């Protein structure tokens, strides 16, 4: 008899040892884990490699954004919105400025509405490019991140050209947008890395206006999405890691208040851009991609299809904006600042400018809820005014908070390695979760 068999028989014959049970153990996942997507801390109860329970701990990025917004004039809180979901900046701004416009009873000019629609979709593509690259990286497909950031860099240049900032744009304003689209795109300058033919190639398409640049981008982007799909969609390893992993049924998705790709991946066709149109979404043509199985693979397919639909919307907006010049800010000077030229010649205009940006404006008493279809789901802003120049109450509805609440119900029964895939498809950003 082998030594192993003898040891096993001795263990089984010991009445004390045989009564002992194998107990589950606890594992801390994050907040320093590279796949935690920020500061997610999961306390996992494990039975071997199988997850028995998952407790998400949040609050490590709490900055008191709602209370900060309540301490500032209405027009000074727009930059705070950029720093919530810091991958979907202008969509956050859109919800906030729409809430102010609703209380004040004003509407942005038509050209500003088209610009907002276009930049919402540029933001959606930027978000999904970041997501597809980082999610693939989490699961071991490293090349996709390099491909995705190639196009994302071009859209970052568009952000910078229109607002001066690559991320925190603060471009939307109550009553319109900060300024009209620029007549030129920034170009790369000669350096030790870029010169000669390579420099000329990088600056191709940047000689004209921003709309010319975006028109060229929309013509080439579908082929770039095909490249991402070549790397992932039929990849055997990718499908093994995502198919039938993290299945969320339609009933479960509704029960947890899911929105965006998380909800549409489960087969529910709900999109605020179609169901409750805002800006100019009722004037553009696009489809709502939905999944069938509700697993990680379906959520991936939904986001890839959304990039194609966003590209369609941008193309339509560019066509309209080229043909229809006009104002991008309301003429209500209670909300809109005077021109820079006017301030230099007119003392009243200078006083008006100073008062507007130091004290702001009083918003009529009332309350409203404004929501937009952000890349991650429904991002909403509940705004209450008591008639002063500062909000009485600001509450922000972050899609990631509702999605993270379902983590325990979704990951139970899956392996530890599958948790990384599921967290990736949640597309969490803790700036908005913790607020």
Curated annotation (Swiss-Prot):
Entry-linked InterPro entries: NADH_Q_OxRdtase_suD, NADH_UbQ_OxRdtase_49kDa_CS, NDH1_su_D/H, NiFe-Hase_large
Source taxon at top rank: Bacteria
Family: Belongs to the complex I 49 kDa subunit family.
Protein EC: 7.1.1.-
Recorded catalytic activity of this chain's protein: a quinone + NADH + 5 H(+)(in) = a quinol + NAD(+) + 4 H(+)(out)
TM stretches of this protein: none
Membrane topology of the entry: Peripheral membrane protein
Name the record gives this protein: NADH-quinone oxidoreductase subunit D
Presence of keyword Magnesium: no
SUPFAM superfamilies: HydB/Nqo4-like
GO cellular component annotations of the record: plasma membrane
Uppermost EC category: translocase
GO function term, MF aspect, one: quinone binding
Chief location of this protein within or outside the cell: membrane
Keywords: Cell inner membrane, Cell membrane, Membrane, NAD, Quinone, Translocase, Transport, Ubiquinone
Function: NDH-1 shuttles electrons from NADH, via FMN and iron-sulfur (Fe-S) centers, to quinones in the respiratory chain. The immediate electron acceptor for the enzyme in this species is believed to be ubiquinone. Couples the redox reaction to proton translocation (for every two electrons transferred, four hydrogen ions are translocated across the cytoplasmic membrane), and thus conserves the redox energy in a proton gradient.
Entry-linked NCBIfam families: NuoD, PRK06075.1
Pfam families tied to this protein: Complex1_49kDa (PF00346)
